[in-house]
Amino acid sequence: KEKYRVVYTDHQRLELEKEFHCNRYITIRRKSELAVNLGLSERQVKSWFQNRRAKERKII
């Protein structure tokens, strides 16, 4: 099975960044809400948050 890279739209990135700014760790309920609102899977939202936290650690 080949893995493909998700390209997020500007709107999706903006909403995810806003959520991350409020809380670095997303709740299960909020993850579900964001996934539905942004047209993403919960796994994609979870992965985005994991990657964003890793990016933050790398910068520091």
Swiss-Prot record:
SMART domains: HOX
Keyword line: Developmental protein, DNA-binding, Homeobox, Nucleus
Database matches in PROSITE patterns: HOMEOBOX_1 (PS00027), HOMEOBOX_2 (PS50071)
Classification via SUPFAM superfamilies: Homeodomain-like (SSF46689)
Recorded GO MF terms: DNA binding; DNA-binding transcription factor activity, RNA polymerase II-specific
Presence of keyword Nucleus: yes
Top-level taxon in the UniProt lineage: Eukaryota
Pfam family of the protein (one): Homeodomain
DNA-binding region: 1-60
UniProt GO cellular component terms: nucleus
Subcellular location: Nucleus
Annotated family: Belongs to the Caudal homeobox family.
Protein name (Swiss-Prot/TrEMBL): Homeobox protein CHOX-CAD2
